[in-house]
Amino acid sequence: MYTILIIDDEPIVKIALRSILPWEEHGFFICGTASNGLEAVPLIEKHHPDIIITDLKMPEMDGLELIRFLKEKEYPGEILVLSNYEDFDSVRSALLLGAADYLLKIKIQPDTLLACLNKTTKKMQNTADRKDSILKTGITE
């Protein structure tokens, strides 16, 4: 079961994300929610979520600041960015900082979110398999 932390300053979005999918039926567990990056940091340290779904525009610590912070701390999980903004610069910045994918809130559908999550978990599994293979064979890059 993959753990997910949802970060968004809009309560309705957090409620919608919790109810958009039967999470556990698809192998996911929502370990918590936060209203901004600053509030999320202790939850990340406590739960070590596999996947973080974060908004970009939030008070106190926005999504880009959170991604930068997590990159500095060498966060091993994946980050999916949700936003209302079709702002190419924000998308590009989030992806360059290491976000796995970017989804628009207004266009999010259960099948779209699930496809994104499945793509992300497949990437995580491939990375883990590759690391295991390297450790077993003693080959380093």
Question: Can you annotate each of these PLM segments?
Answer:
Residues 36-39, 62-65:
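Acidic catalytic/metal-coordinating carboxylates
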Residues 58:
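Receiver (REC) domain active-site loop signature in two-component systems and cognate sites
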